[in-house]
Structure formats: C-alpha cells, structure tokens
C-alpha cells in the first residue's frame, strides 16, 4: 500500500500506487568481488595473464586442449570459455562461433543528498541502488550497438529522469560518473553452459546477459562439476551448448 511504501522509503515519490517489499534483496560491488575472487584463487595456486587474450582453442593429443594467445600457447586438461561478450571472438577449431553478442548498458552514479535512499528500488524505467559511500547508482540502459562502450548524453538524461521519478530529491544530485559495460546476450537469453561436443575438455560458460554476477555461485558449482567429472546437475540440460548445434 502507498502508506506502507512511504514508511519504508520516505524519499520515494508520493504518487506511487504501491510496492512489493523483498527483504532479502541486496547488491554487490562487482570490482571488489572480482578482486577478492582473484586474490583467493591466487592463494590456491591460480595464475593470471591479464595483458593478453585468447585467440584460438583447439583439441590436443590425449584429450587435452590447446589455447593460443598472441604470445603464448597453453595446454590443459580442461579449458573454460567464459569470455562474456567476446566469447564469439575466440575461434574454436571445428566448432561454430558461440552465438553471443554484446548489449551495452549505461549506469549513473549520483552524489545523493544524505538519506536519499534506504533500499534498492525498481521502477518501470530503471532501478536505484544506495551505495555504501552515500552515492546512488542508477541503472540501466539496454542498447544493441555492438562493441561500442562509449556513454551518451541521451542515456544520461533518460536515467536521471527515471531516478527523479522514483526519488524526487535526486533532482539536484550531482553526476559523479557514468559507467558502461557490455552484457553477453544469447539468442534465447539463457546462459550457454556445458561441455563442447566438438572439443573434448572444452567447457562453455557464457551468455549470462544481465545476471552474470548474480549467477556466479551457481555457475561456479555447475562448472566445477564438469571440470572434475562429477555427476552434472539436471539444470544443465536447459543450458546445454548443443541446443545451438556445432558447439
């Protein structure tokens, strides 16, 4: 009810017809999460090469897999193709390209007035996230523009308008930054996750679209089962790369 909504979120627009409260709804800092995961992996022996990208994947003798980069050739028992929006840019010998394309998303960070927002709010034209430093994140656009990661004035204005429609006090908020990213979208908006039928030892984990970070724990569990040859989760049937053929 409107009265209850105002009690939980006093700064919200007074003309709201109502709202659904989800007490467990949260958010995560992607950069911090990624750095934490990488640090933890290094402690267990992982090595990272961030200055070069994979170019080609092909089968190797004895069921192994070869990955070629611009300056190295690597062999492994298992290789996971998890290149997000760039997954189709890595050629897999004998296989079709992964049917994934980039969808640009733009997001604003506003320097909000104190107490502007208590919780994550979703509305018809966007969402707001109260950040620990007092700022508010405003998201986000969905744009089919290829690999263009520039931000646009039109998107900034539309997102600011969406923010003000949800929390009017944000009308005077200063724009701190604009972020852009590319989401990996598959033809059916469902992740591509499973073993390759063409290259033994190759595992696909891509096309998570707008929910890659949210799906991280599940993706890790499913891929781990495949890497270590454990019984696969039945959920993988709906995610199988074979549904597109040639993978």
What are these regions (language model features)?
Residues 1-44, 49-50, 56-60, 185:
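Flavin (FAD/FMN) cofactor-binding and adjacent substrate-gating region
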Residues 55-75, 79:
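Conserved beta-strand-loop-beta-strand element in the redox core of flavoprotein oxidoreductases
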Residues 30, 167-247:
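C-terminal catalytic lobe of FAD-dependent flavoproteins
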Residues 64-65, 135-136, 203:
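Hydrophobic residues embedded in beta-strands of well-ordered beta-sheets
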Residues 1-2, 50-52, 69, 177-179:
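Short loop/edge segments at beta-strand edges and connector loops
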Residues 19-40, 85-86, 155-162, 208, ...:
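Mid-domain beta-loop-alpha active-site segment that forms a flexible
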Residues 73-74, 78-200:
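Active-site substrate-recognition segment that forms the wall
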């Amino acid at each position: 009810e409107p009265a209850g909504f105002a009690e939980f979120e006093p700064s919200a627009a007074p003309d709201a017809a109502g709202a659904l409260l989800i007490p467990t709804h949260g958010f995560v800092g992607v950069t911090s999460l990624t750095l934490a995961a990488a640090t933890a992996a290094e402690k267990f022996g992982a090595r990272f090469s961030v200055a070069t990208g994979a170019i080609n994947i092909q089968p190797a003798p004895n069921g192994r897999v070869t990955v070629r980069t611009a300056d190295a050739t690597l062999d492994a028992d298992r290789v996971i193709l998890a290149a997000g929006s760039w997954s189709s840019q890595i050629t897999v010998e004998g296989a079709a390209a992964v049917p994934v394309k980039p969808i640009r998303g733009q997001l604003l960070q506003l320097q909000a007035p104190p107490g502007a927002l208590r919780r994550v709010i979703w509305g018809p034209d966007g969402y707001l996230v109260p950040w620990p430093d007092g700022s508010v994140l405003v998201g986000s656009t969905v744009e089919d523009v290829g690999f263009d990661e520039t931000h646009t004035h039109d998107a900034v204005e539309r997102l600011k308008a969406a923010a003000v429609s949800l929390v009017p006090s944000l009308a005077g908020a200063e724009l701190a930054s604009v972020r852009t990213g590319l989401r990996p979208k598959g033809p059916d908006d469902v992740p591509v996750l499973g073993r390759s039928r063409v290259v033994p030892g190759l595992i696909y984990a891509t096309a998570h679209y707008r929910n890659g970070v949210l799906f991280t724990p599940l993706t890790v569990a499913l891929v781990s089962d495949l890497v270590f040859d454990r019984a696969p989760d039945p959920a993988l049937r709906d995610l199988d790369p074979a549904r597109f053929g040639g993978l």
